[in-house]
Amino acid sequence: MKDKHIAVLMGGFSSERSISLSSGAACADVLEEQGYRVSRVDVGAHIASVLEQLQPDIAFNALHGPFGEDGRIQGILEYLKIPYTHSGVMASALAMDKGRAKIIAANAGVCVAPSRIMNRFSIGKTHPMEPPYVIKPVCEGSSFGVVIVQENEAVPPHNIGGSEWGYADEVMVEKYIPGRELTCAVLGNEVLDVCEILPDQHFAFYDYDSKYKTGGSLHICPAKLSLNIYQSVQRMSLAAHQAIGCRGVSRSDFRFDEKTGELVWLEINTQPGMTSTSLLPDIAKASGRTYGDIVQWMVEDASCMR
């Protein structure tokens, strides 16, 4: 296996480009240390031609956001018959669409928060649901575009319908669940430990800065929860992973309100970050796996027709 040529796909042209470059560089470094022949590929418009010239044995997908985790790069890799890591075309497309992913997860017995999909221009000056609630782009990651509307706000934020909104017009309006931020990864069909995320006090919630700035958040893994809640998070993570058809690794995010006992699944990430501040490496460490172990497993798991 170590004589394989691996193309690490990174960068791209989504809002998460910088994160992808960090994830990709870290994964490429580890693969080179493990003895693989590695090509670092900053994905652009001509990626199909680039891959045809490189002829890699495996494509390691370290892309994040639209194009990288919504089924499009996966479709190109299927067409070129290049085995690749992470989820396939269908699961990637479904998981990227928060609305459709929630429907599938709920049908699999996963608890979700009440929500509705709307065009941002239709929100206007009337609350689309009783505050507090969250407005977020349907197909973005890393908390880009997330707005929390508090109980004391008389009208929805004006920027949702403004020209400064930098995302697609379709948004999800979802009931805000207060409480603890939890996440859980699935590796193949093995569910790993539950991790609690504690954003630094300077951040209102687990936003982009708290995710990627050094010291922006504290990861407690395994999370200190009752056995019932802990196992519920694991069960729902695996159920969502399987129902959506994910392959390789995924990570599901949750909110847990201790006052009411309400535990809800928020979304699933089919391309979890692999930066120095990312959650997956810490979750893997709690299960006795090193960063290199996870990357090695992904390479060995790579295939087409995922």
Swiss-Prot record:
| Gene Ontology, cellular component aspect | cytoplasm
Query: Is Cell wall biogenesis/degradation among the key words of this record?
Result: yes
Co-factor remark: Binds 2 magnesium or manganese ions per subunit.
Q: What is its EC number?
A: 6.3.2.4
Name of one Pfam family that matches:
Dala_Dala_lig_C
Residues crossing the lipid bilayer are none
Q: Does the keyword Oxidoreductase apply?
A: no
Residues annotated to bind ATP: 128-183
Cellular location of this protein? Cytoplasm
Needed cofactors, names only, are: Mg(2+); Mn(2+)
Q: Where is Mg(2+) 2 bound in this sequence? A: E267, N269
Q: In which pathway does it act?
A: Cell wall biogenesis; peptidoglycan biosynthesis
State the UniProt keywords alphabetically: ATP-binding, Cell shape, Cell wall biogenesis/degradation, Cytoplasm, Ligase, Magnesium, Manganese, Metal-binding, Nucleotide-binding, Peptidoglycan synthesis
Specify the superkingdom: Bacteria
Binding, Mg(2+) 1: D253, E267
Q: Please list the reactions this protein catalyses.
A: 2 D-alanine + ATP = D-alanyl-D-alanine + ADP + phosphate + H(+)
GO molecular function, one example?
A: ATP binding
User: Top EC class per UniProt?
Assistant: ligase
Which GO terms of type biological process are on file?
cell wall organization; peptidoglycan biosynthetic process; regulation of cell shape
Every copy of the ATP-grasp domain together lies at 102-300
Family classification: Belongs to the D-alanine--D-alanine ligase family.
Tell me the function of this protein.
Cell wall formation.
Q: What is this protein called?
A: D-alanine--D-alanine ligase
Q: What gene codes for this chain?
A: ddl
